[in-house]
């Protein structure tokens, strides 16, 4: 097998912004086999130790322009002057990525001598570059070293990448729906495949050879079967769906030497870039087709237009700059070094525009509904604009919610990258940093939305309350509603003078805040008369079991210190088992029960994935997006689940009909492992102390 000669050292080493590809090796200990023509010449050369050139340095940029301006005839003349065979001419000159089908793969061809020669010599000794795994056993399982070699020899022309971006025909809404549906289907196939392998393994226990074959199958899956989430995005207007389907990738031969896991990582990073291009296209359509429509400008008052579109221009400007940097990273090499360093920088310095936009969501939705109801001209014009083929049948509301969907999806895309990078590597550290920054942005967005809606909700509740006891201030910046609803209070069997039994239960209404419980009775005029209250931390609950049909779904609520500074006990009946469980979970979340214990962290905890989106109807419910994975903490007989979402650890109730259970224990274990890896930057000592406090509070009860 032919290999690079010493001139392979001529390509300047590629470095990312966060120095992810630092030089970590000394002089090469092994040299690849050289052709007879060049072996003697190379042996007589004195070893040189050169400092690698930074990717964006002035020298490196000048060299790239110089090589780009050089004509093909000049390059051939240089090759002939170096006594190279005609059949081994280089096809990897910087920024000249025209790869004829008849030429040899680029890792077999020499490059020109230049800075970074020392590490190029080491990289040329990796498997796939002329040395077999038997000759270099230490490098057999070293995809990172192999990737560093590839980083130096595969530039991609800017025009090729820009053409790819322009040919993306999917709007972001289409991409998002198809991507999540494909993710669900991929999990189903993996679940069924691994279950099939497990069944086959058990059936062949008596045959040692068959057992070994079955164990090897899941460990070495076919390289092309591990498709990323974007693989179903087939579209007549978008030729390229996968990184490995790009003509430059196909003709370069890198797929023959990349490890399968590195290929998956490349696909994950490629999806982040192409999805950002699709998102920018949808934002641009929102601005050009809707916001800047002259007829719409005349219909809307400036204040209405400001609330409706908010700072979408700022969001689009940030997306444009973000996409431009991602494009530049793609142009540098077909083998992508990293994108998380760019994501981290933008999340830390520029993504605050998303917080501003999303925080306005409550007013935006209300204004949009009012305009549709009150302004006929607005409603008719929007309907007309939505019929335009550009919109592909999508409503304006789907465009207005794009920024919040994107910032959430971006965090998941970084998680997908994080799952595939090498553990302990610098790329893992950068991905963790990017994920942490994105998580902070998403939390700030959620808090912004909640703050706006909570303030209005607290004002509305305060107006409806009449206090029979000492008044309690309801409105507070640190207080919000967790749950409200009607329950039946058991008053006990009492007999009137006419010997007719009074009603065993009577209705009461509860308002549960994050720090306060208010117990009321509903009175005419949509008002509530408050007759008792207690701090939430002084509540205890107890479930009554096997008490017959009359006491079904009954639980005891104990106030350790109520409004009169006394202990009070209420026997309450809910309308269903799920309603009882939901009230008990909300009233005393730290009580000693199985659905708020550490079972969410156990490997045998049941899991489900969301197959139908669900919007929370109550504060204690959890909004679900397609492909969300959740641990089951509690499941009721009437079809409700209390679960914890893995990617953000949010808890809440949701209908079981919106999900399907993941049956295979290997898939569940893998999901938990990936979850632990994503969130491992959290302080373990802090989590341990928090768990100890929870355990202690339950033991005291």
From Swiss-Prot:
Residue ranges of domain PH in the record: 480-592
Residue spans of biased composition, Polar residues class: 120-132
Transport as UniProt keyword: no
Region (Disordered): 1-141, 187-226, 679-701
Keyword Phosphoprotein: yes
Any one Gene Ontology molecular-function term assigned to this protein's record: guanyl-nucleotide exchange factor activity
Alphabetized SUPFAM superfamilies for the sequence: DBL homology domain (DH-domain), PH domain-like, SH3-domain
Listed Basic and acidic residues bias regions: 1-11, 26-48, 679-690
Feature: compositional bias, Acidic residues: 206-218
Segments of this protein annotated with the region Regulatory region: 1-264
Tissue: Expressed in telencephalic neurons (at protein level). Expressed in brain, spinal cord and testis.
Superkingdom, natural source: Eukaryota
Subcellular location field: Cytoplasm; Membrane; Cell projection, Growth cone
GO biological process terms on file: cell differentiation; ephrin receptor signaling pathway; negative regulation of dendritic spine morphogenesis; nervous system development; regulation of actin cytoskeleton organization; regulation of GTPase activity; regulation of synapse pruning
An example Gene Ontology CC term for this record: cytoplasm
PTM info: Phosphorylation by CDK5 upon EPHA4 activation by EFNA1 may regulate dendritic spine morphogenesis. Src-dependent phosphorylation at Tyr-172 upon EPHA4 activation increases the guanine exchange factor activity toward RHOA.
Modified residues (Phosphotyrosine): 172
PROSITE patterns referenced in this protein's UniProt entry, alphabetically: DH_2, PH_DOMAIN, SH3
Alphabetized UniProt keyword annotations: Cell projection, Cytoplasm, Developmental protein, Differentiation, Guanine-nucleotide releasing factor, Membrane, Neurogenesis, Phosphoprotein, SH3 domain
Task of the protein: Acts as a guanine nucleotide exchange factor (GEF) which differentially activates the GTPases RHOA, RAC1 and CDC42. Plays a role in axon guidance regulating ephrin-induced growth cone collapse and dendritic spine morphogenesis. Upon activation by ephrin through EPHA4, the GEF activity switches toward RHOA resulting in its activation. Activated RHOA promotes cone retraction at the expense of RAC1- and CDC42-stimulated growth cone extension.
Domain notes per entry: The DH domain and the PH domain are both required to mediate interaction with EPHA4.
Subunit structure: Interacts with CDK5R1 and EPHA4; activated by EPHA4 through the CDK5 kinase.
PANTHER family the UniProt entry points to: EPHEXIN-1, GUANINE NUCLEOTIDE EXCHANGE FACTOR
Protein name: Ephexin-1
């Amino acid at each position: 097998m032919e290999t690079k000669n010493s001139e392979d050292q001529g390509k300047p080493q590629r470095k990312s912004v966060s120095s992810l590809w630092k030089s970590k090796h000394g002089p090469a200990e092994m040299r690849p086999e050289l052709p007879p023509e060049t072996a003697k010449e190379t042996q007589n050369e004195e070893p040189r130790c050169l400092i690698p050139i930074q990717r964006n340095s002035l020298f490196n940029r000048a060299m790239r322009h110089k090589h780009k301006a050089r004509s093909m005839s000049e390059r051939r003349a240089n090759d002939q002057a170096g006594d190279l065979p005609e059949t081994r001419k280089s096809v990897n000159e910087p920024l000249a990525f025209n790869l004829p089908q008849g030429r040899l793969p680029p890792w077999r061809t020499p490059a020109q001598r230049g800075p970074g020669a020392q590490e190029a010599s080491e990289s040329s000794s990796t498997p796939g570059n002329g040395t077999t795994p038997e000759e270099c056993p230490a490098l057999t399982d070293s995809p990172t070293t192999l990737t560093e070699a590839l980083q130096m020899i595969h530039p991609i022309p800017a025009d090729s990448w820009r053409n790819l971006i322009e040919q993306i025909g999917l709007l972001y809404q289409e991409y998002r729906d198809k991507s999540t549906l494909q993710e669900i289907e991929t999990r189903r196939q993996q679940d069924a495949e691994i279950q099939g392998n497990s069944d086959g393994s058990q059936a062949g226990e008596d045959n040692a050879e068959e057992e070994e074959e079955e164990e090897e199958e899941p460990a070495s899956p076919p390289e092309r079967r591990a498709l990323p989430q974007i693989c179903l995005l087939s579209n007549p207007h978008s030729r390229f769906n996968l990184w490995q389907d790009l003509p430059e990738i196909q003709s370069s031969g890198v797929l023959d030497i990349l490890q399968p896991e590195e290929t998956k990582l490349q696909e994950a990073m490629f999806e982040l870039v192409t999805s950002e291009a699709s998102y920018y296209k949808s934002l641009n359509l929102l601005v050009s087709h809707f916001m800047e429509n002259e007829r719409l400008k005349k219909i809307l008052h400036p204040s209405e237009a400001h609330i409706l579109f908010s700072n979408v221009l700022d969001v689009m400007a940030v997306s444009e700059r973000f996409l431009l940097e991602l494009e530049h990273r793609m142009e540098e090499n077909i083998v992508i070094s990293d994108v998380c360093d760019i994501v981290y920088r933008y999340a830390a310095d520029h993504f605050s525009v998303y917080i501003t936009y999303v925080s306005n969501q409550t007013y935006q939705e209300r204004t949009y509904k009012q305009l549709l109801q009150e302004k006929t001209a607005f409603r008719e014009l929007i309907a007309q604009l939505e019929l335009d083929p550009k919109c592909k049948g999508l409503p304006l509301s789907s465009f207005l919610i794009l920024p919040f969907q994107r910032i959430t999806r971006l965090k998941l895309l970084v998680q997908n990258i994080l799952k595939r990078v090498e553990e302990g590597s610098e790329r893992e550290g950068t991905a963790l940093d990017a994920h942490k920054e994105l998580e902070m942005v998403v939390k700030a967005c959620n808090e912004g939305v909640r703050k706006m809606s909570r303030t209005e909700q607290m004002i509305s509740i305060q107006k409806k309350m009449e206090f029979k006891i000492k008044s309690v201030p309801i409105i507070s910046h640190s207080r919000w509603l967790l749950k409200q609803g009607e329950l039946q209070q058991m008053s006990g069997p009492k007999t009137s003078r006419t010997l007719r039994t009074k009603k065993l239960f009577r209705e009461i209404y509860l308002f549960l805040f994050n720090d306060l419980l208010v117990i009321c009775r509903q009175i005419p005029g949509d008002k509530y008369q408050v007759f008792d209250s207690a701090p939430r931390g002084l509540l205890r609950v107890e479930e009554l079991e096997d008490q017959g049909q009359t006491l079904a779904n009954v639980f005891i609520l104990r106030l350790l210190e109520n409004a009169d500074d006394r202990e009070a006990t209420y026997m309450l009946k809910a309308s269903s088992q799920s309603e009882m469980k939901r009230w008990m979970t909300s009233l005393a979340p730290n009580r000693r029960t199985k659905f708020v214990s550490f079972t969410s962290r156990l490997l045998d905890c049941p899991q489900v994935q969301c197959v139908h989106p669900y919007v929370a109807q109550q504060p204690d419910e959890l909004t679900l997006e397609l492909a969300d994975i959740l641990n089951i903490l509690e499941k009721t007989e009437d079809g409700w689940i209390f679960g914890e979402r893995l990617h953000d650890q949010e808890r809440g109730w949701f209908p079981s009909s919106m999900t399907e259970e993941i049956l295979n224990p290997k898939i569940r274990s893998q999901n938990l492992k990936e979850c632990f890896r994503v969130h491992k930057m959290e302080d373990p000592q802090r989590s341990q102390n928090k768990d100890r406090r929870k355990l202690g509070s339950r033991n005291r009860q």
